[in-house]
Amino acid sequence: DSSTSRGLGDVYKRQFLNCFALADLLVRAAPEEKTGLFALVNNITEAVRAMFWLPGEARPRAGLWYPAYWEDVEESPAHILLHTFSGQGYHYRQCFLDGKILSAEYDAIFPDGHAAEDQGVAAMLCFDRLRWPWNLTEKAKAPYREFLAAHTGLVLQRLLKAQDTDSIKDLLALDVLDAAAFAEGAALAAKADNAAAAALLADAEHKKRGSAPKKRRYDFDF
């Protein structure tokens, strides 16, 4: 993890160049503020998450993932260097203007396709965007919820590995798990030997079943 302040200069650009083991950037600012995040994420090609978490607050205000991308450089016969980028991570890193995040542009990328991306990172991107929905419109929520509902197991694997019970509660609160997802989650919790997670999943499934509308029965006497 790395904690960052609002203003980040060339020293940070040099510090994070070619960094491949970074997981989270902790930004001590509100997501709508101008920060040095653009400089950081554009010098990190691996997947990284920026968490906007102000001191004294119980939860982050936003968690934005920047998936990995690859840059290829080819020299043409005319000795012109041609740069090509693979992976949506490059496009996510361009969603800034004057140091501020362009949330609408960021959210517009996901529906364009993510089949070639790390599906675990894509699932976490959806999860974090939904549980900390800064500037998230109802229209933008739909593709995130759809993808997350189909890949809850990938998120649970990460959360169980981290023993992050609070985040498991956040996932359950989004109400995206169906019967198959609950069954997969129970199996993952058992494999991880995590009784607390298993209990949370069982309780959430029981409540969901209990809240489902019951079919009406009609009795006819002839």
What are these regions (language model features)?
Residues 1-12:
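Short, small-residue-biased leader/transition segments that mark boundaries at the very start
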